[in-house]
Design a protein with these regions (language model features):
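N-terminal glycine-/serine-/threonine-rich phosphate-binding loop
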Residues: 1-36, 109
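Ligand-binding beta-strand-loop-alpha-helix segment within the catalytic cores
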Residues: 1-4, 59-135
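Glycine-rich N-terminal segment of FAD-binding domains in flavoprotein oxidoreductases
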Residues: 30-55
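Glycine-rich beta-strand-to-loop/alpha-helix junction loops that act as flexible
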Residues: 38-43, 136-140, 193
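A glycine- and small-aliphatic-rich helix-loop capping segment at beta-alpha/alpha-beta transitions
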Residues: 50-59, 82, 86, 149-158
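A short secondary-structure junction signal
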Residues: 112-113, 145-150, 200-202
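Class I SAM-dependent methyltransferase SAM-binding "motif I" and its flanking Rossmann-like core
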Residues: 134-180
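ATP/nucleoside-binding phosphotransfer catalytic cores, i.e., glycine-rich phosphate-binding loops
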Residues: 180, 184-202
């Protein structure tokens, strides 16, 4: 399978947001039911600001999962799903049933197992989920999803979703897609904004 890498630099957040929204428009047109994985953090505000004003965006048939998720109640501002839900569902842009979520009431190991089961149901017939598009952030330390530099989870190859209970960045308990799942996606976009990310990108 051939692969290519493209680096795009945008002079403003507005232009970055517009580019991401157009990517989602294009992916929606090319996919029969877009299978999308999203990250949280600053990406939530960026996408939730841009998507409602994207006229050509058709979210019908979308299924939206998360590249990682913090083990907190959905009402907590730290919940990635909670933030997307609060910003997008009331606008009618997407329905709650289109999201694939963790169960934050479970212990972190069980939450990872439960999320694995849900992803296997979404990608029936595939041992390894193959997302159409993953949109990931990058932290100042270089972490993406909840995969942190030097952490043992980087070596995990036998799981779809892994639990983490010692995240260097709070909250400590999270679940995350593993590197094999990220690498298997059709398209992966890494979004980095602000001066704090410049050093790690260089």
């Amino acid at each position: 399978m051939s692969s290519s890498c493209q680096i795009c630099v945008f002079p403003s957040l507005a232009e970055l947001g517009f580019s991401l929204s157009q990517l989602l428009v294009n992916e929606s047109q090319c996919s029969d039911g877009l299978r999308l994985g999203l990250s949280g953090g600053s990406l939530v505000q960026l996408l939730c600001r841009e998507l409602p004003k994207t006229a050509a965006l058709n979210t019908e048939g979308w299924r939206v999962a998360f590249c990682d998720e913090r083990l907190v109640p959905f009402s907590d501002p730290e919940s990635t799903y909670g933030e997307y839900k609060r910003n997008l569902v009331p606008l009618g842009l997407i329905s709650e049933s289109q999201f694939v979520t963790i169960d934050p009431t479970l212990p972190v190991e069980k939450a990872a197992e439960d999320y694995t089961k849900k992803l296997k149901e979404l990608f029936s017939g595939n041992d390894l989920p193959k997302f159409d598009l993953l949109i990931l952030g990058i932290g100042p330390d270089g972490h993406t999803a909840s995969l942190f530099p030097g952490h043992p989870l980087l070596e995990v190859t036998d799981k779809i979703v892994a639990p983490i209970s010692d995240s260097p960045k709070p909250p400590p308990e999270r679940v995350t897609l593993t590197l094999p799942v990220i690498n298997a996606a059709k398209t992966v976009v890494f979004v980095a904004t602000g001066e704090s990310k410049a050093t790690i990108l260089k």
